[in-house]
């Protein structure tokens, strides 16, 4: 057991923090309860210091205000941190007694601490733990941390315009009008936001409704000026100017109340020259509807669980596990590539699964007692309950099953994709964002059931499910790249395309000289968008109710 633990820790300890485009920012609110002071005759002046681990070292991120003589402090200062789903972000909250005459830290001032990951906080939304001091509980003191997404504006707005009595610019027919909307930038430049279709031969056109992100429309500022221009289309590209007007998103939102918002379309030249000029027509906004675009953290904080499943290749091409050249060879202290990949990805996913029970399967081996070939057997040999307790449990089940198997073949992965897809399909019956499935497949060779696998992936693309494939060893994986839709659209043998890209494939050798965290970062970076794409595409909102949200904001530990 000691060797297993060493292998697990060896793989896990290399996980670090990387700089990459931030998915989102999270605000952390902190409160403590029952803080005990070293001096029983007085109350402490507590301050909470947030530290983050990078490359094995802890560094201070920020600290709260000091609350004088208080054993149950609720801090107003918020911690703002960048959130990366694909990384293990280790945090330490330290409570110190800061006396009024100094702001430094002494060992005697330390009242207790708590370590966790940012993933644990956001998945539970409200995390309460006992404070520890030198490995022991610090009396009855505890700390509570609440996470809240500091979101940008990713909402979309749907707009529909029509016009009345536009100027006629054509001699032998009526104008062919279209509308352009420009955002006025801070540097006095203007950015085209949308161009409508052309409505032919019509002075009172009704343009089709369109959607545009609020960020694109006004950079999130409802008071930003918008310039709208109406043109008469000409086939030679020299469109005739009809008129223009300016507005703001704030003004346009008046149409959300069922009212029409309208503007006079003005031609400045006509207005300057013609004494009785009124306008060149009227433009009416008859629809303004905001579509909420929920984020990954909206779903996670709303209670969506990540159901992590692992499938391991036990085909003969891996080599005899008793031989040190085998990809399945168990070194006493150095994890093999299968274990490195498993721990790197599993360490992250486990924070988003409340029960920490992970189904683990094998494929391509003859299994006891009859030693028939199976492509979806439980590596704990309990087909009724293939779940293992934590990533450590998966590691132990993997090492325990190796001597009992006969490595064989072929390398078929469609059965395991279909097995997980069946569970994901049952989840769709709830019509809720309750569970999203991630299947990690670890394989040493090119799969032999490509047609069936393509069919299974196309089917799975309609389900709350993502597939991560890591190729271990030195095989030629060029044919595997076709499963990853980055270079084109994957299709079933019958020609049906995937509904969305759900597969990520990487060869482990690309990360051989990097830490396993780099592998996890590569294969998991797309998962948040895949989760959002699925639920937004289905019109499924986060499960969290307003009552649950309000209760999570309560800081009483």
From Swiss-Prot:
Keywords: Calcium, Metal-binding, Repeat
Gene Ontology, cellular component aspect: extracellular exosome; glutamatergic synapse; plasma membrane
This protein's record includes keyword Nucleotidyltransferase: no
Binding site for Ca(2+) 2: 170, 232, 234, 240
Pfam families: C2, Copine
Signal peptide (residue range): none
GO biological process: cellular response to calcium ion
Domain of life: Eukaryota
Keyword flag Transmembrane: no
CDD domains assigned: C2A_Copine, C2B_Copine, vWA_copine_like
Domain named C2: residues: 3-131, 137-264
Cofactor (UniProt): Ca(2+)
InterPro entries xref list: C2_dom, C2_domain_sf, C2B_Copine, Copine, Copine_C, VWF_A, vWFA_dom_sf
Tissue: Widely expressed. Expressed strongly in the brain, heart and prostate. Expressed strongly in peripheral blood leukocytes.
Residues that bind Ca(2+) 1: 170, 176, 232, 234
Disulfide bonds: none
Residue ranges occupied by any VWFA domain in the UniProt entry: 305-507
Molecular function in Gene Ontology: calcium-dependent phospholipid binding; metal ion binding
Quaternary structure annotation from Swiss-Prot or TrEMBL: Interacts (via VWFA domain) with ACTB, BCOR, BICD2, CCDC22, CDC42BPB, CEP162, MYCBP2, NONO, PDCD6, PITPNM2, RDX, SKIL, SKT, SPTBN1, UBE2O and WTAP.
Database matches in PANTHER family: COPINE, COPINE-4
Protein family membership: Belongs to the copine family.
Role played: Probable calcium-dependent phospholipid-binding protein that may play a role in calcium-mediated intracellular processes.
Protein known as: Copine-4
